[in-house]
A protein has these predicted regions:
Chain A
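Long, compositionally biased stretches
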Residues: 1-67, 87-93, 97-148
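Extended catalytic/binding region for NAD+/ADP-ribose chemistry, centered on the ART fold
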Residues: 71-74
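Short active-site loop/helix that positions an aromatic residue
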Residues: 76-85
Length: 148, 75
């Protein structure tokens, strides 16, 4: 199927790859079908594009790239809801709020996106502890820092 | 909004499955116990609101964002 996207124009997507957020996301309760789009030449960020609303897209990333020790436990309810059987099936992503300059961007560690890769069921999981912030700073070595 | 007065150890039932009890009142703070089916998600309001706000902020980025990102995030 073809969809119109916020950032990359019209694209063709494989229906098998649709990600189902059955109860939407906080603030977007009606949005339950998304697709992950890779950014060409960028191996850190992906786009989580709503299939229903072309103007709705989030920039997401693997939080472990920024916070190596990021860790939490999934409660029974989400394990049942997403029918998680194997830890290996679980993909964790964080929504990034991009700022200009880029290094001022933040990621939401308090409410990670949990995706069961096997059946494509997903949910934004709100951690009950205050251990991780909604606006966690990112620090990524820039090309200059790496001496590239 | 329905307003009910309750004392310590009293409770409110919502529907068949949900019970909200007042466990303790200490000055300005009230300790509330909530019994509900697992499918009912219970959050402190300010946390839920913060997530909602953050989601809407993250969804409202400029459409020319990708141009800005070019070359910034290559590993």
């Amino acid at each position: 199927m073809h969809i119109e996207t916020k950032y990359v124009g019209k694209i063709e997507i494989d229906e098998q790859k649709l990600i189902h957020f059955e109860t939407g996301l906080p603030g977007f309760k009606e949005e339950n079908k998304f697709v992950l789009i890779d950014l060409p030449g960028n191996d850190v960020l992906q786009i989580l594009q709503s299939v229903q609303t072309s103007e709705l897209a989030f920039i997401v990333t693997n939080p472990h790239l920024f916070y190596k020790d990021y860790e939490f436990t999934l409660d029974e309810h989400i394990i049942e809801t997403l029918q998680i059987e194997n830890e290996q099936d679980v993909v964790v992503l964080s929504i990034m709020t991009i700022q200009d300059p880029f290094h001022a961007s933040t990621i939401n560690l308090q409410a990670p996106l949990i995706i069961n890769e096997r059946n494509k069921l997903a949910k934004q999981y709100i951690l009950s502890s205050d251990e991780y912030p909604v606006k966690a700073k990112i620090s990524l070595p820039t090309n200059e820092e790496k001496g590239v | 909004m329905l307003v009910l007065s309750r004392k310590t150890k009293e409770a409110i039932r919502i529907g068949d499955d949900i019970e909200v009890s007042i466990l303790a009142i200490e000055g300005e703070q009230v300790k509330i116990g909530i019994q509900a089916p697992k499918s009912i998600e219970v959050y402190r309001k300010e946390i839920y609101d913060a997530i909602q706000l953050q989601n809407s902020e993250a969804a409202n980025l400029p459409e020319n964002l990708l141009t800005m990102l070019e070359g910034k995030t290559k590993k």
